[in-house]
């Protein structure tokens, strides 16, 4: 994109389509300025400014949801495609960043660590994810993805005095570099093949999704293109935590700060699915003969591995990480079905929103029960929670029930919509595996609920009370947790216009 293209975009007022992303960047810079201006004892206001600013940007996206740019795939010289799915993901990522910021107020205070940089990185990473969901070009896709990834490298190792956090950061860095290498190598192969003048339909812009799709449709059996697609798919599989690229999840989820773990579990995973949804219905389409069996095998292995591995976990952060692997498998079913069933796109979006509500509620409870070293959170620590803090116990029960897919909660409806789409697409074997996965997941989710409601905490004989002291629930956190739980119930009982709109996408 050269200077003339920038001027052309300005003349068409295309920059106004990026107001939310630009506003997030400006808000991130504002936080740094406020840090220099405010006295140190007033730095607590910075978190409030960040949260209020994000609510303002969310309000703008909601007000401008039916943007005049919707449907265009040539914005910024073809880098961006504004769509309703992209708008929905904008809302998703803003909600995620708001809840992460609220969690950070609770969690970071225990470690006595700088907070301004945390909010700054979250804002920049959120802007990158919003661009990623609207990418129509591999250049923007890769730049946005790496901007997100670099921010996550820092956030994962944010507890610089914790060996587990530093270890998690190093593991995530190594695995992230590997996945980026696979992804970039795949993009290079596609770029080289589609720009080859000796092949039919070669294009001058082989990294544009639309141009690349047209080329691949004319060359549906090119070996190098097939290899490139598999490598790109492998790079994305790392982000969503799909088998066999989920190996980093348990250790990284345990060692990272709780707000960062929530950010990884929800936002980063959703960003991967957002771009995968675009690619499956564009670039990967002509090679569906290859992509479908790969995704089907990946979905089956992801569901079974995630659920079976979670059965043996006692650390709740590792448990929620491995259960998130199984949810990636369920979402892959929706992605596969979306190639032939249009309503599957809405089913995936609804599942993601239901997953957001339940997962952030669980992490909100975890943040209040964790001590200074929040990597050591065991199921035993939740024993007697219903008696000691009925509010947190109720939130936890609703959230885990939704993740397990228990009616009438939003998680149940999300799974139901995805399963219906898979049934319409004829993937009956996948449905059978998914049902087995749901049954297995009920065991460990309800084991967690059982500990909170039906067990009593008994300190071990070799320690007075190794269980960390619980943090009182503040007003902002209490409202956020109650909202998450109530919305999980509401969207399970009544989807209304929102559900109808999502399923019409």
From Swiss-Prot:
InterPro entries: NADH-Q_OxRdtase_suN/2, ND/Mrp_TM. Its main location: membrane. GO terms for biological process: ATP synthesis coupled electron transport. Pfam families: Proton_antipo_M. It catalyses: a quinone + NADH + 5 H(+)(in) = a quinol + NAD(+) + 4 H(+)(out). One of its GO terms (cellular component) is plasma membrane. Belongs to the complex I subunit 2 family. This is NADH-quinone oxidoreductase subunit N 1.
């Amino acid at each position: 994109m050269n200077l003339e293209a920038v001027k052309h975009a300005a003349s068409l007022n295309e920059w106004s389509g990026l107001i939310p992303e630009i506003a997030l960047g400006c808000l991130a810079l504002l936080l740094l300025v406020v840090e220099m201006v405010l006295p140190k004892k007033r730095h607590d206001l910075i978190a409030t400014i960040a949260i209020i600013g994000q609510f303002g940007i969310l309000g703008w996206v909601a007000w401008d949801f039916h943007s005049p740019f919707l449907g265009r795939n040539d914005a910024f010289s073809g880098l961006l495609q504004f769509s309703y799915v992209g708008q929905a993901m904008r809302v998703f990522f803003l909600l995620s960043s708001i809840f992460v910021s609220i969690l950070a107020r609770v969690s970071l205070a225990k470690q006595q660590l700088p907070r301004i940089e945390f909010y700054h990185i979250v804002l920049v990473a959120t802007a990158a994810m919003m661009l990623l969901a609207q990418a129509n070009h591999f250049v923007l896709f890769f730049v946005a993805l790496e901007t997100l990834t670099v921010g996550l490298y820092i956030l994962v190792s944010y507890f610089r005095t914790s060996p587990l956090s530093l270890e998690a950061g190093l593991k995530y860095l190594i695995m992230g570099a590997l996945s980026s290498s696979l992804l970039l190598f795949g993009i290079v192969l596609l770029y080289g093949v589609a720009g080859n003048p000796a092949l039919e339909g070669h294009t001058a812009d082989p990294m544009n999704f639309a141009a690349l799709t047209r080329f691949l449709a004319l060359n549906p059996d090119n070996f190098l293109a097939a290899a490139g697609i598999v490598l790109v798919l492998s790079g994305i599989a790392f982000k969503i935590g799909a088998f066999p690229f989920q190996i980093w999840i348990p250790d990284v989820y345990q060692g990272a700060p709780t707000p960062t773990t929530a950010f990884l579990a929800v936002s980063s995973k959703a960003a991967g699915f957002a771009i995968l949804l675009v690619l499956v219905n564009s670039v990967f389409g002509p090679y569906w003969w290859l992509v479908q069996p790969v995704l089907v095998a990946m979905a089956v292995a992801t569901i079974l591995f995630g659920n079976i591995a979670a059965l043996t976990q006692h650390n709740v952060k590792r448990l929620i990480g491995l259960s998130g692997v199984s949810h990636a498998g369920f979402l892959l079913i929706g992605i596969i079905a979306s190639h032939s069933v249009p309503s599957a796109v809405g089913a995936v979006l609804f599942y993601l929103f239901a997953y957001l509500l339940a997962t952030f509620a669980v992490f909100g409870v975890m943040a209040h029960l964790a001590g200074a070293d929040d990597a050591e959170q065991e199921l035993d620590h939740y024993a007697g929670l219903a008696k000691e803090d009925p509010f947190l116990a109720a939130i936890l029960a609703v959230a885990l029930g939704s993740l397990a897919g228990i009616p009438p909660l939003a998680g149940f409806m999300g799974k139901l919509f995805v399963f219906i789409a898979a049934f319409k697409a004829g993937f009956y074997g996948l449905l059978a595996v998914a049902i087995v996965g749901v049954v297995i997941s009920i065991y460990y989710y309800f084991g967690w609920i059982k500990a909170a409601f039906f067990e009593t905490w008994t300190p071990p004989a070799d320690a007075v009370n190794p269980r960390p002291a619980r943090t009182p629930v503040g007003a902002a956190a209490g409202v956020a947790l109650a909202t998450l739980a109530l919305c999980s119930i509401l969207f399970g009982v009544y989807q209304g216009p929102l559900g109808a709109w999502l399923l019409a996408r």
